[in-house]
């Protein structure tokens, strides 16, 4: 069992938890993920490592409350324990030797982008960060990004905070201002990453994307997280989650991402009923 030592609501639908997991904290690197199961009879879900403290032996996870399992996870309180917490899994993001990078995060994807931006900053890399949200009330981790970014652009769809617009507009502006990046790292909704990659292609920039499809075992056995990358089948859990943005078949990934929505909706309703929570 893995004890919850801290729990914070970052916005109405996103929660941060700090979990006691010394062996994972000792080995975790930015870009890797954990397979989490809140209760013995819960489904397994992948959550990317959002931070770690090797001395304290803790690992941070940040998740959006969208389905049955995340509702169950969010029902746990400080002092209680998560049933399964397996990792670190996947390949760490390669950050060595980079001198100037733009990190682009969207929504809860910013939780994945943050430890990568931190690692780059600690290595002396110039980091420009662009984060996007639908509105001000969904904003997360602004101060944390400020602390590890040489420049930070905050975008909101409705203009309620930062600059009104999408993250690709900010990337266009940064390049127009004379910035040339060794790499653009983008993490967020599939449609956002698809258009960030297109923007990078327009400017001749290399990009990598973090793919977080449906995942069950996290070791490549089930095939649930398969993707087409460069015309070949890859598995996000063992070959990724980072891939060359130019090679990912985003349309296929988006189509696969909608396959289980009816089941997810039923699981969400069942979890809400079980925990006496209102379905929103």
Task: Describe the residue ranges of each PLM region.
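Ferredoxin-reductase
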Residues: 1-80
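Structural signal for conserved beta-strand scaffold positions within catalytic alpha/beta enzyme cores
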Residues: 6, 51, 154-156, 209, ...
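A generic structural signal for residues embedded in beta-strands
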Residues: 36, 84-85, 227
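Short, surface-exposed secondary-structure boundary micro-motifs
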Residues: 39, 87-88, 230
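Short, Lys/Arg- and Gly-enriched loop/turn segments at beta-strand edges
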Residues: 42-50, 89-99, 237
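FNR/FR-type flavoprotein reductase catalytic core
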Residues: 68-216
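Local cysteine-cluster metal-coordination motifs and their immediate loop/turn environment
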Residues: 112, 190-191, 212-242, 270-275
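Short Fe-S-cluster ligation motifs
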Residues: 235-239, 243-280
């Amino acid at each position: 069992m893995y004890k919850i030592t801290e729990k914070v609501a970052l916005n109405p639908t996103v929660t941060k938890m700090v979990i006691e997991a010394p062996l994972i904290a000792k080995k975790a690197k930015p870009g890797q993920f954990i397979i989490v199961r809140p209760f013995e009879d819960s489904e397994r879900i992948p959550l990317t490592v959002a931070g770690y403290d090797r001395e304290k032996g803790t690992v941070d996870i940040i998740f959006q409350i969208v389905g049955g399992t995340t509702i169950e996870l969010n029902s746990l309180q400080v002092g209680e324990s998560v049933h399964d917490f397996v990792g670190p899994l996947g390949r760490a993001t390669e950050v060595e030797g980079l001198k100037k990078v733009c990190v682009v995060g969207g929504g809860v994807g910013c939780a994945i982008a943050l430890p990568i931006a931190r690692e780059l900053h600690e290595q002396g890399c110039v980091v420009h960060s662009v984060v996007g949200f639908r509105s001000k009330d969904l904003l997360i981790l602004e101060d944390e990004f400020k602390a590890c970014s040489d420049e930070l652009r905050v975008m909101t769809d409705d203009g309620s905070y930062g600059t009104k617009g999408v993250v690709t507009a900010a990337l266009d502006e940064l390049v127009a201002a004379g910035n040339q990046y060794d790499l653009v790292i983008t993490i967020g909704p599939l449609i956002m990453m698809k258009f960030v990659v297109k923007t990078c292609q327009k400017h001749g920039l290399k990009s990598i994307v973090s793919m977080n499809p449906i995942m069950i075992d996290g070791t490549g056995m089930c095939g649930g997280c398969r993707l087409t990358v460069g015309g070949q089948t890859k598995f996000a859990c063992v070959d990724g989650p980072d891939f060359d943005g130019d090679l990912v078949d985003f349309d296929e990934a988006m189509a696969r991402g909608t396959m289980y929505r009816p089941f997810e909706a039923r699981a969400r309703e069942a979890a809400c009923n079980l925990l006496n929570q209102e379905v929103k």
